[in-house]
Amino acid sequence: MGPPSAPPCRLHVPWKEVLLTASLLTFWNPPTTAKLTIESTPFNVAEGKEVLLLAHNLPQNRIGYSWYKGERVDGNSLIVGYVIGTQQATPGPAYSGRETIYPNASLLIQNVTQNDTGFYTLQVIKSDLVNEEATGQFHVYPELPKPSISSNNSNPVEDKDAVAFTCEPEVQNTTYLWWVNGQSLPVSPRLQLSNGNMTLTLLSVKRNDAGSYECEIQNPASANRSDPVTLNVLYGPDVPTISPSKANYRPGENLNLSCHAASNPPAQYSWFINGTFQQSTQELFIPNITVNNSGSYMCQAHNSATGLNRTTVTMITVSGSAPVLSAVATVGITIGVLARVALI
């Protein structure tokens, strides 16, 4: 190792700022009897990242430092030693090539692994040979992968099917969370979590359960969320409605009826008059009706996915006489006819 008189170029800017702050605090603070302490930044670190062990309240008469892996000073656990006077760092048996010691006694460990989890001890060597020691620690968690969701049924039928979502992969010491349409999971007796929250089960699905589902995995050092999975709930048809609700007509009017039923996928419609099939359309149009068009008009809605049919019936009565032309209209027609005769 070369002399760590200045942070190496590979050091990220945040560590430079932290080290500078620590150095200034050490320089400006007057001698105190405060106890030597170690701060880990961060305390929880993701695998592959880096962690900085900061020393606080260094004694004034220090002449060197030694860092050890573990909670006690042991030659076999020595990571690196540093002599202030010569600014020389000497690696020990526990040195892995990922550690960098700084003049303010801070230790940077890069590309951490889960094996790095644990305690680290700093020994400050003083000119009076009354050395001081302090121990710090940090925890390394795995860098979480992007999870994915599998489902046993992405097109369930309302009030008939149950759906089980599973968030994968399984990772130890990890929290599993679920999101529905971008919101946290609602409280419902039909929603059940199991297998450490990895599995979300929807019992007897409802149409309101349709939407986007995501799972998120978390540990104290990182988090990751899956791509959304869409749940398409098949339902209906509900009992259809016929509009307009008008029931009484006069001869010569036009009859225009429309049928609608809530359904997923959209319903297919059929019309029956007095029990006789007429046509398969959502609208029924009969121009210039007569009294013979009176009767029962039934609309049938069919869902090809659920296999269900729903019907509704309206009674249409055609009575009275055809609309009579007004006197003004009659005079207008007469004048028009006479004018055509005169031209001939």
From Swiss-Prot:
Q: Which residues form the propeptide?
A: 321-344
The entry's note on the tissues where this protein occurs is:
Expressed in neutrophils. Expressed in columnar epithelial and goblet cells of the colon. Expressed in numerous tumor cell lines (at protein level).
Q: How does it sit in the membrane?
A: Lipid-anchor; GPI-anchor
Q: Where is the lipid attached (GPI-anchor amidated glycine)?
A: G320
Tell me what happens on changing I38A: Loss of homodimerization and heterodimerization with CEACAM8
What is its subcellular localisation?
A: Cell membrane; Apical cell membrane; Cell surface
Q: What is this protein called?
A: Cell adhesion molecule CEACAM6
